[in-house]
Amino acid sequence: DLHSFPTRRSSDLHIADVMYVVAVAMDQLVTKIVLMDLQNRYVSEVEKFELSLANNREALSTLTTRIDNFLNNLSIDRSKILGIGIGMPGFVDAAKGINYSFMHANGQSMNEYISSRVNLPVFIDNDSSVIALAELRFGAAHNKKSAMVINASWGVGLGLIINGELFRGHNGFAGEFSHIPLFLNNKLCNCGKMGCLETESSLLVVIEKAHKELKEGKASLLKGLPHDQVEQACEVLVDAAARGDKLAVKLLSEAAYNIGRGVAILIHILNPEIIILSGRGSSAGKIWMAPIQQALNEHCIPRLCENTEIKISGFGFHAELVGAAVLVMEHYDMSYSPKKGQLLSIVDSTVSTSL
């Protein structure tokens, strides 16, 4: 079940024997926060709230306040929390703790800004990289040497696994799959360029196309699709597709085919062992598979793609939260634990029964 995840109440735990991490998953519109134990399980309810990042000078302050309030409402002392991992959209330099697209901290790293206010170590990374970390450590990319993790959401992100490690590129900006110029459609992307993959295949575009077709009188279960609540609209769209609605299936299939065209280019360059569709859009499940495969059939040299596995993530909406927790574990300060390796081995040994 893609919509369930193990949860344990803090009262069920022996607090003195365990440590925790706070995982924060952000996209351009919605943020989620949860407390997790080192066995990769939710210990608190997921707190979700709207936080628009574009042109929002208060976004960083708001995020910090929400994290601090979340911590204050826990029954667990902050000394039991190893740190806070945050996945977020944008051009993120994880090493410097800077997001060049959103939530500027006036020259200070976001890590330092948030950490100084909540008194815990903070680590940030791009949302698609964080999702790829989740797949690499605990998901479909585990023990794979090369993998491409597609983050189908309001944009179309990419996490690259090369030689068994997350590849971030020179400045940490690798994986801007959304902005591969694929179309001569005269559509302006939010990056300022024309014809990017995102302009035909993001979930925002799919919802926009749905509204257009409904306005033209197309019969569909999508009638009444929300206009100003895109997350709810996305859920309605995916649910309608799962129920066999022709319009919903058509729109998602078109997006999937276009993503497949982009994937064909990447396969020619990287020849990966596996391609994993993850992130928000993965909740549509097998609807994505046939159109992506059809695009590969048409645009990819058979010898290059015939041994590449395509898989839907088992994490569903949880991928970014799991990856944010991994982000803390991978940066674990030696002063907080005997050995980083011991921490990771604890998680690895339990993940098969936790997910």
Task: Outline where the language-model segments fall.
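Glycine-rich phosphate-binding loop and adjoining helix at the ATP-binding site
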Residues: 45-146, 287-298
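Short, small-residue-biased leader/transition segments that mark boundaries at the very start
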Residues: 2-10
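Gly/Thr-rich phosphate-binding beta-strand-loop-beta motif of the actin/hexokinase/Hsp70
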Residues: 9-45, 149-162
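Glycine-rich phosphate-binding/hydrolytic loop that grips phosphoryl groups
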Residues: 123-138, 282-355
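Glycine-rich phosphate-binding loop of actin/hexokinase-like ATP-binding domains
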Residues: 143-201
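Hydrophobic "anchor" residues
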Residues: 42, 99, 166-167
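A mobile "lid/hinge" subdomain adjacent to the ATP/sugar-phosphate binding pocket shared
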Residues: 197-268, 273-275
